[in-house]
UniProtKB/Swiss-Prot annotation:
Function field: Exhibits a very high intrinsic GTPase hydrolysis rate. Involved in the addition of a carboxymethylaminomethyl (cmnm) group at the wobble position (U34) of certain tRNAs, forming tRNA-cmnm(5)s(2)U34.
EC number(s) given by UniProt: 3.6.-.-
Quaternary structure annotation from Swiss-Prot or TrEMBL: Homodimer. Heterotetramer of two MnmE and two MnmG subunits.
Protein name: tRNA modification GTPase MnmE
Entry binding sites for (6S)-5-formyl-5,6,7,8-tetrahydrofolate: 23, 82, 121, 442
Residue ranges of coiled coil: none
GO molecular function terms noted in the UniProt entry: GTP binding; GTPase activity; metal ion binding
Family stated for the protein in its record: Belongs to the TRAFAC class TrmE-Era-EngA-EngB-Septin-like GTPase superfamily. TrmE GTPase family.
UniProt-listed Gene3D superfamilies: P-loop containing nucleotide triphosphate hydrolases, Probable tRNA modification gtpase trme, domain 1, tRNA modification GTPase MnmE domain 2
Gene encoding the protein: mnmE
Length: 442
């Protein structure tokens, strides 16, 4: 990537829409825009919007709004011009072609964000958060990405960096004055411990952050032929699972994504629980039991028209809901239990609204206050912080056993890893790998 050239790209998704945005950034952005816009772009003040015509080679392309943001007060830190034209394919494509013909280069994926990073407008954590905002598949993932983009994670990383620097400075003073027989190491010990506490807090949040980003897992379980697959289809409002009256039809775990009021749920349909001599069905039942243990919650489906068998003990070890299916045929004999129970019909939809409301309330209660804290969701961040924790633990354990110079080496290694996180120590190849995942125009 050449930092001194000017790049251009369409910043909105392709297809029909009310408007499309073409973005231009670089030292020649204003000069190039001035050559195709009817107004005098060079004379426009920064952060102003102007209505005019886009004309190239004496041909009118479109009437558009032009937004000008002069360096350094722009997202990339460079001169930025955006054309807001009519949506669809042709207007924005012709504007982009004109900009390229006049000297702009087609932007690479994520290149606008990469320039923002290289110009110090955002750090690498914030740059990665931009991509996570775009690809978020539920409201929790979006909010977590938002906390990262707002700099909350970066502030904690800076706090860790400062604590390590302060501990390192103290140790370097001791190394310069070795005549001190019994140096007081309480100060670096406290700094290292505080830094390690923050790092370990983030590491421990990784699994929960992943769960929030990926969605809550709910498993549909129960005896064979109670209507689990019919219920899956009813909740998804589409025929996803095969429904028959033959017990044991479902053998593999069937997973579907279900978006419920912005909450992403991984809905799993499993084999019915029964004793069988069929080896393939046995394997499906074993997988279902394993999935029940790993799931966040269980929807245990019961046939209200059949005699009730004992409930499995696992229902009382994690959030579980009893769904009495076929309630359109007979009133269900509710149990005297603490588990929430619902009379439903996968066939008519009876009771499904109440089930959805209960699931939403349960998830909101489970996640109350969680998305306001900073979670670790990136595997890259997780791996780096594990290395930081290792270095800090080594320094902590050897603080009274090794010379200050040896402890300082561990702390410098921790600082290097912190730099990999923020982007201060990152290599060109890693940057390329990160930003290549972005869409063009971002």
């Amino acid at each position: 990537m050449l930092k001194h050239d000017t790049i251009a790209a369409i910043a909105t998704p392709p297809g029909e829409g009310s408007i499309a945005v073409v973005r231009l950034s670089g030292p020649q952005a204003i000069v190039i825009a001035d050559r195709i816009f009817s107004g005098s772009v060079a004379s426009f003040a920064s952060h102003t919007i102007h209505l005019g015509q886009v004309i190239f080679e004496e041909t009118l392309i479109d009437q558009a709004l032009l937004l000008l943001m002069r360096s350094p007060r722009s997202f990339t830190g460079e001169d930025v011009v955006e054309f807001q034209c009519h949506g669809g394919f042709f207007a924005c494509s012709q504007i982009l072609d004109a900009l390229i013909a006049l000297g702009a280069r087609p932007a690479l994926p994520g290149e606008f964000s990469q320039r923002a990073f290289l110009n110090g407008k955002i750090d690498l954590v914030q740059a990665e958060a931009i991509q996570n905002l775009i690809v978020a598949e539920n409201i929790d993932a979006f909010r977590i990405a938002q906390t990262h983009f707002q700099g909350n994670f970066s502030k904690k990383i800076q706090e860790i960096h400062t604590l390590i620097i302060e501990a390192l400075a103290f140790l370097e003073v001791l190394a310069d004055f070795p005549e001190e027989e019994q140096p007081d190491l309480l100060v670096p010990q406290e700094k290292i411990q505080n830094a390690l506490h923050i790092v370990e807090d983030f590491i421990s949040s990784f699994d929960e952050g992943q769960r929030l980003a990926q969605g809550t897992s709910l498993i549909l379980a129960g005896k064979p032929n109670v209507g689990k697959s019919s219920l899956l289809n009813a909740l998804l409002q589409k025929n996803r699972a095969i429904v028959t009256h033959i017990p044991g039809t479902t053998r593999d775990i069937l997973e579907e994504q279900w978006l419920l009021q912005g909450k992403r749920i991984r809905l799993l349909d499993t084999a019915g629980q029964r004793t069988t001599d069929n080896d393939i069905e046995k394997e499906g039942i074993e997988r279902a039991l394993s999935a029940m243990e790993e799931a966040d919650g269980i929807l245990w489906v019961i046939d209200a028209t059949q005699p009730l068998e004992d409930l499995p003990k696992i229902l009382f070890t994690k959030p579980s809901f009893l769904l009495w299916n076929k309630a359109d045929l007979t009133p269900p004999p509710f149990l005297d239990t603490s588990l929430p129970q619902f009379a439903i019909s996968a066939k008519t939809g009876e009771g499904l609204t109440q089930v959805k409301q209960a699931l939403i309330q349960w998830m909101q209660k489970q996640e109350a206050g969680k998305t306001s804290k900073v979670f670790l969701v990136s595997s890259r961040h997780h791996m780096i912080l594990q290395e930081v924790a290792r270095c800090l633990k080594e320094a902590q354990q050897n603080l009274y056993l090794q010379p200050p110079e040896i402890i300082a080496l561990e702390l410098r290694e921790a600082l290097h890893s912190i730099g990999m996180l923020s982007g201060k120590e990152v290599t060109e190849s890693i940057l390329g790998e990160i930003f290549s995942k972005f869409c063009i125009g971002k």
